């Protein structure tokens, strides 16, 4: 006789494990299925984010930036360190320990909340039955009233650059280099490519980023993207736009990349090549042919505004559905679905999902960009405040970038907040909170901000919307 649950979640990433915990907290008998094995060969919860994505990449970004500071900035503070060297294996080991700590923490939370964990591959069958196949090939079928599909995504592979996880690697392989490559190529100038390129550039690699599109960071506010390209180029990233990779050849532990740009066919040799051209949903072998769940032509699961699929009682969240592939988006969808299964009226505001690129300076935004609003014909007022005018940023020797606030010209309601600069990820969240409550730029300008603080840049940008910034000359409105 099969086990019966109220909710079964397939996939223990940021969407799945959060959905499982929330379901259990709401009194639902919950099971969670995960097949991923970590480096030690044991089941590791947390999905791509905790294991080979958000967290390990941030660990390497922080380590590499500390090296950069010691090498370039300490002397400005009167600190003498002698010769600064990087021990890459130690840096990688630190990253791995952080991953173990966090995935172990998730496992403890799953247990503490009474969620039943099944280790193996989960597959949705007809009639909301779920088959779990263990690593040894044994299987069992579980019964449930509700299923949450949260199987995540994986890196996109391209024929011109087949990944071997040695010379040509994907985002996972790029987290485990044991030495700094002399010349590093990156295909894709998106979030992953820029972050990983930054890690190894700071440590001394000569980095070239090949981007097929003619525009840099097209989804980011244009003013921010332009500033980002200028700063990252100055940091040593050679960014080639309109460069379409046509082939690769690996020989003697080097790879020659062939590409075409506006000038014609070209080639360049690298010690390592990172393929970072996006991610695709993991839906292969997730659904039985008679499960009733519908996929689109790209393999995403069709869902409504509340993440419900075409089958009553079956939901899908995170990277397997429409929208941005972001861990925090997946987590919130998991909470909303659990709440709705429990009979509560929950919904998610997809218009206010912050997005961050963890380069240095960080790049972050929430709400609409200036170019999007102009394309919609919305009349706007814009306020910008540079970190070069921030006392706190000066004290930290971290003055690149600015905060930008966009408000409706008629109502003054804040429609977008965009930041490039120190702690942009934290500052943009203040904008998200304000926008969630329908705040006007004037409201933000009337609030008291601590001094000295980086957040004062948000305050001043809000004041600048109406031409009343205090610590920078105002543009005539």
From Swiss-Prot:
It is an enzyme of class 1 (oxidoreductase). Binds 1 FAD per subunit. Pfam families: Pyr_redox_2, Pyr_redox_dim. It catalyses: N(6)-[(R)-dihydrolipoyl]-L-lysyl-[protein] + NAD(+) = N(6)-[(R)-lipoyl]-L-lysyl-[protein] + NADH + H(+). Its main location: cytoplasm. GO terms for biological process: 2-oxoglutarate metabolic process. Keywords: Cytoplasm, Disulfide bond, FAD, Flavoprotein, NAD, Oxidoreductase, Redox-active center. The keyword Cytoplasm applies. Its cofactor is FAD. It is found in: Cytoplasm. One of its GO terms (cellular component) is cytoplasm. GO terms for molecular function: dihydrolipoyl dehydrogenase (NADH) activity; flavin adenine dinucleotide binding. InterPro entries: Class-I_Pyr_Nuc-Dis_Oxidored, FAD/NAD-bd_sf, FAD/NAD-binding_dom, FAD/NAD-linked_Rdtase_dimer_sf, Lipoamide_DH, Pyr_nuc-diS_OxRdtase, Pyr_nucl-diS_OxRdtase_dimer, Pyr_OxRdtase_I_AS. Its EC number is 1.8.1.4. FAD binds at residues 34-49, 58, 122, 319, 327. Disulfide bonds join 49-54. NAD(+) binds at residues 188-192, 211, 245, 276-279. The active site is at 451 (proton acceptor). The pyruvate dehydrogenase complex catalyzes the overall conversion of pyruvate to acetyl-CoA and CO(2). It contains multiple copies of three enzymatic components: pyruvate dehydrogenase (E1), dihydrolipoamide acetyltransferase (E2) and lipoamide dehydrogenase (E3). PANTHER family: DIHYDROLIPOYL DEHYDROGENASE, DISULFIDE OXIDOREDUCTASE. Homodimer. The active site is a redox-active disulfide bond. Belongs to the class-I pyridine nucleotide-disulfide oxidoreductase family. This is Dihydrolipoyl dehydrogenase.
């Amino acid at each position: 006789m099969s086990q019966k649950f109220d909710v079964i979640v397939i996939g223990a990433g940021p969407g799945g494990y959060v959905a499982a915990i929330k379901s259990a907290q709401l009194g639902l008998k919950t099971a969670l299925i995960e097949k991923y094995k970590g480096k030690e060969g044991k089941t590791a919860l947390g999905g791509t984010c905790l294991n080979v994505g958000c967290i390990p990449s941030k660990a390497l970004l922080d380590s590499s930036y500390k090296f950069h500071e010691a090498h370039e900035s300490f002397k400005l503070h009167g600190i003498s360190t002698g010769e600064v060297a990087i021990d890459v294996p130690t840096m990688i080991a630190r990253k791995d320990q952080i991953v173990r700590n966090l995935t172990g923490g998730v496992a403890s939370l799953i247990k503490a909340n009474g969620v039943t964990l099944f280790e193996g591959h989960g597959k949705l069958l007809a009639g909301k039955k779920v088959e779990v196949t263990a690593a040894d090939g044994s299987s069992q079928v579980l019964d449930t009233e509700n299923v949450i599909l949260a199987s995540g995504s994986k890196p996109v592979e391209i024929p011109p650059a087949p990944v071997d996880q040695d010379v040509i690697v994907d985002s996972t392989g790029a987290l485990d280099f044991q030495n700094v490559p002399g010349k590093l190529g990156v295909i894709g100038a998106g979030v992953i490519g820029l972050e990983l390129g930054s890690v190894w550039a700071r440590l001394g690699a000569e980095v070239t980023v090949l981007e097929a599109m003619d525009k840099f960071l097209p989804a980011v506010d244009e003013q921010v993207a332009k500033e980002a390209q200028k700063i990252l180029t100055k940091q040593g990233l050679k960014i080639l736009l309109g460069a379409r990779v046509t082939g690769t050849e690996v020989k003697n532990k080097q790879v020659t990349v062939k590409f075409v740009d506006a000038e014609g066919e070209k080639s360049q040799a690298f010690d390592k090549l990172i393929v970072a051209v996006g991610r695709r949903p993991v839906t292969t072998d997730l659904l039985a042919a008679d499960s009733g769940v519908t996929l689109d032509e790209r393999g995403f699961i069709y869902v409504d505004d509340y993440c419900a699929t075409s089958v009553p009682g079956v939901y899908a969240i995170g990277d397997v559905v429409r929208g941005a592939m972001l861990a925090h988006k997946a987590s919130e969808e998991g909470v909303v679905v659990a709440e709705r299964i429990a009979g509560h009226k929950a919904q998610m505001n997809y218009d206010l999902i912050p997005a961050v690129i963890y380069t240095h300076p960080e790049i972050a935004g929430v709400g609409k960009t200036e170019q999007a609003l102009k394309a919609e014909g919305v009349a706007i007022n814009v306020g910008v405040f540079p970190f070069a005018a921030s006392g706190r940023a000066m004290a930290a020797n971290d003055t690149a970038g600015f905060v930008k606030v966009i408000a409706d010209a008629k109502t003054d309601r804040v429609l977008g907040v965009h930041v490039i600069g120190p702690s942009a990820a934290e500052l943009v969240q203040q904008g998200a909170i304000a926008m969630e409550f329908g705040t006007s730029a004037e409201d933000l300008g009337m609030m008291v901000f601590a001094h000295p603080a980086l957040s004062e840049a948000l305050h001043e940008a809000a004041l600048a919307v109406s031409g009343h910034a205090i610590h920078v000359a105002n543009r005539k409105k």
